[in-house]
């Protein structure tokens, strides 16, 4: 049971971390082209 819980918690944490990074990257990427377009 312990072994099953450890990997389970790690997967959840990893998923959350990846989701956060993906969202941040997406926001930055979208802002970059959006700002360059009007600037151009």
Swiss-Prot record:
- What are the start and end residues of every segment in region (Disordered)? 1-40
Describe its PTM? Phosvitin, an egg yolk storage protein, is one of the most highly phosphorylated (10%) proteins in nature.
- Give the Low complexity compositional bias ranges: 11-32
Keyword annotations of the record: Phosphoprotein, Storage protein
Any one GO MF annotation of this record:
nutrient reservoir activity
Q: What does this protein do?
A: Phosvitin is believed to be of importance in sequestering calcium, iron and other cations for the developing embryo.
Q: What is this protein called?
A: Phosvitin
């Amino acid at each position: 049971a312990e072994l099953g819980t450890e990997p389970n918690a790690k997967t959840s944490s990893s998923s959350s971390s990846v989701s956060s990074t993906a969202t941040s990257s997406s926001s930055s990427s979208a802002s970059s082209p959006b700002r360059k377009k009007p600037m151009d």
